[in-house]
């Protein structure tokens, strides 16, 4: 058994036999290492080498040793772009229409990459590469991202040897939900000890590369480094925040003009490009009040500090590659996943989950918290006016299929593979993120396999852009793009590009409040991108026949690549199905501590339902105290604990507005059953009760209960994120917490917004 592939000779003895050793799977010695650096929500005009006002010397360093692309496009959203990047196929084709968090019941949105679309990591691993994923993943259904899995779509099961990072679409930069390989792992330090997740990610990435080069340098590596930055929350170390104080006081109108002029001067936009008109909902800077300007500047400073800090981490990686003597033979691609985000409303927010709950923040509250902005005590996102600056010179934002959502920076650097004579040049051929995987495969001389892990593969749909590395490609008219067409679709927003023309239709202005009319009622615009880079001149009226052909082409491509059905109703961003075996399908939860932290989608939906929590505790001395359950962070969450005086406490923290219930008497010594109950009106206020051994102990009204609580999930027996200032985190429970049970009212209805369906009945059984 097991000898079918043996090519030696087996006799009765070794003297009569001939040994044989299979050749190891190793690429040729000239094979480059691969590094893909992925930024999050970073617009076309944010990086310094693209005209941005933030110092990014290390991205600039890459650009100076390589090429910048100014006609490169993504899907307008994070999970879909990642799916395209890693597979070379369109996001609908592989089951990732939108966010990985949900399965809508259609093939184009399963919340995971189809296994018929093998990832770059799976292909390269089979060719002998070491493969590392560090940072944001967001390609696994989040209900499967807990310590219990299943792990079918975790990084290690999709071709990576190692993983260190976070599974969710965003995370608190000071209190991330970390996983290592196939298991959750604690944050190694506290913010007070200098922790920031971007620095931690680079520690891990550099460590993986150094280990590989030290122990098995014969194997080239593929490092996929996906930062949480610059996705909100915009958080950075204090010294970076201080550096940017006062740097944006001129306001977003002046700054946008400055970016535009820098882009023209650098040549990253064509001569004659116009600066697109102000987006609706962005007021002229001079119309803002003094307080609105103060807050807006501070929020932009936090963003700048975060990007600056991220650039410094990229510098650490580049320095490490040089120290190891491998920088010349390493192909680096740096890009963003979509345009700058408008999720900070018109005036900004100090907690990003206000956006997902549809709750703007009062200005006076932001003024009061202005010194928290950018620190671990905030969860900020900037106003849309600053996002418009980041998307200069284009229109609209992340999730839109206009240029502000889908045109992104791409830098390619490969000193030993791209002639130094082209260093610093700009390439203008139209390309899309699905083209990067085919580019890498072409460079390596690898054909896309017909089967991966026994699964027959879909055709690769991208077009290699390796032809643009040549010196003659500086002239896109002389060396035109090899792409024929590219569709875009996100939340009903649609576009189609072909032969230098783009037709685009906006279906929604806000992802949580979509246009209620049908897709056929949407207006289509037509732009000639070859002469109108910033999509300023709508030619739909003067070119009706061309527009008609483009619309027909969109529907043809949509059918070809699995775009249909297009989700056209309000709230589809968070639509999903209560799959059996998941929290959305259950109303009773039983935990036997200790249990690792659960991500929000793998925990009970405490924001959207009415619930009862019961804790079986033992306090044999009577002085035991600590946290029983915590969900969220300092900025938004809820926590149940026994205080040092022995009182049962429930603290409901709605965007730092605390409602605190405290039992009048101490919890008895010995064994007790402690209970917290909460009911709510749909999207409204609620009421909570405390019970100790079945006896009512406290009750209070709760003025606001956010439906979506936090990107940070639920802990039992401790609270590392410090939801309350009444104790010092993690305030681990010093007694015995033997059992936690949670019962909820069923509120999920298939094909509707799972997160927003709530019954008002109070649980009594």
Report residues per predicted region:
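Exposed, low-complexity/repetitive linear segments and helix-based recognition motifs
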Residues: 2, 13-15, 529, 756, ...
